[in-house]
Regions:
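Acidic, glycine/proline-rich low-complexity segments that act as flexible tails and inter-domain linkers
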Residues: 1-89, 103, 107, 254-259, ...
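Glycine-rich anion-binding loops and their surrounding alpha/beta cores
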Residues: 9, 64-69, 89, 104, ...
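Short amphipathic alpha-helical face segments that pack within enzyme cores
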Residues: 40, 95-99, 287, 291-294
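Hydrophobic pocket-lining residues that define ligand/cofactor binding sites across diverse proteins
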Residues: 45, 100, 208
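A generic, well-ordered mixed alpha/beta core segment in the N-terminal half of proteins
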Residues: 81, 85-142
Length: 334
């Protein structure tokens, strides 16, 4: 690869082809680019802004050089946020995944340790004694026996370790921050994604259209990368784009302090447990129900109304199904 030619094109604000960014990613994993060249690449693309095809090419490279998670069921969903909203909320997406699984839907949750908050998905899962694995037999047993499997990103996306130190040293986020939500190694056909701004919503909307999956992208207008119920929120799916108000769905408006994830991993885990045990604050429970409901709607492909999806999510908590699902998950994966 002629890296000098790539840099010249980037400096001239030219776009790279999907195959080219895939090759760039593979070259990084082979040690063909120096740290200085990787740093320059990340900086140049960040300054110009990444295109849909460029992002998809980097995604292709990560999936090709990573460990696949071949699950033996056809339809399952991942619920994830981009992170970086600096709101330090509790583990809303992760909790929602167990509510969705408790409602009878298959979930392949892809996650990692926290980058900007107190507790990420992997933190709260590990806090309960779960051992991460890339063993396909164990992964398939988990999704088939309790409806949910957890895919710890560091075991699968091998390419990320080649840029980890450089990303940490740079004083700004890079396009690698955008890749996390779209490199689930099981390649789910359904995804619900929370983004922290409308520019990201537009980008992922085009990305998902090209990937060809069923999706919902959500953004709270006040900057949360999930449905926060603190005010209006926007939802973009395969079929519609709409702004909702919490009261449109029968929910009270939440206060920002009710979403806080605590000061420690242990406090974050306590909130996670409280929601599944149906002892959480009403706002915490409602936020999880709202997020889970839109995930269920993606899985249903319009066969259920949003109100019915909300009822399914609420019942998953109220009848104890979400909690039983989590206990079975911990039992299988510890």
């Amino acid at each position: 690869m002629d890296i000098k030619s790539v840099f010249n094109r980037l400096l001239n604000h030219e776009e790279l082809q999907r195959e080219e960014t895939k090759d760039l990613l593979i070259a990084i994993t082979k040690g063909e680019l120096s740290d200085a060249e990787i740093c320059a690449l990340l900086t140049a693309i960040q300054m110009r802004g990444i295109t849909v095809d460029e992002l998809l090419g980097f995604r292709d490279g990560i999936l090709e050089t990573g460990v696949p998670a071949l699950l033996d069921c056809d339809r399952y969903i991942d619920v994830v946020g981009t992170g970086g909203d600096r709101k330090n909320t509790f583990n809303i997406s992760t909790t929602s995944c167990f509510v969705i699984a408790g409602a009878g839907y298959k979930v392949a949750k892809h996650g990692n340790y926290a980058a900007t908050s107190i507790s990420g998905a992997s933190n709260v899962i590990k806090n309960h004694g779960v051992t991460f694995t890339d063993d396909l037999d164990k992964l398939n047993r988990s999704i088939n026996e309790c409806g949910i499997v957890y895919l710890h990103a560091q075991l699968f996306a091998k390419a990320m370790k080649f840029v980890a130190a450089i990303r940490k040293a740079l004083p700004f986020p890079t396009f690698f921050n955008l890749l996390g939500p779209i490199v689930n190694p099981s390649c789910p056909k359904c995804q619900m994604l929370g983004v922290s701004n409308l520019d990201q919503m537009r980008l992922y909307h085009q990305v998902y259209q090209k990937i060809g999956i069923d999706y919902a992208i959500v953004n709270s207008i006040d900057g949360y990368d999930e449905i926060s119920l603190t005010g209006d929120f926007k939802v973009t799916t395969n079929n519609y784009e709409r702004i909702f108000h919490p009261k449109d769905l029968g929910f009270d408006i939440a206060r920002p302090e009710e979403l806080k994830g605590g000061a420690t991993e242990e406090e974050a885990a306590e909130i996670f447990d409280a929601v599944l045990n149906n002892t959480a604050l009403p706002a915490q429970k409602n936020i999880v129900i709202a997020n889970a409901a839109f995930g269920i709607q993606v899985m249903e492909k319009g066969r259920k109304s949003l109100e019915e999806c909300i009822d399914s999510a609420r019942e998953s908590i109220d009848c104890g199904a979400a909690l039983r699902t989590f206990k079975k998950f911990v039992e299988l994966n510890s």
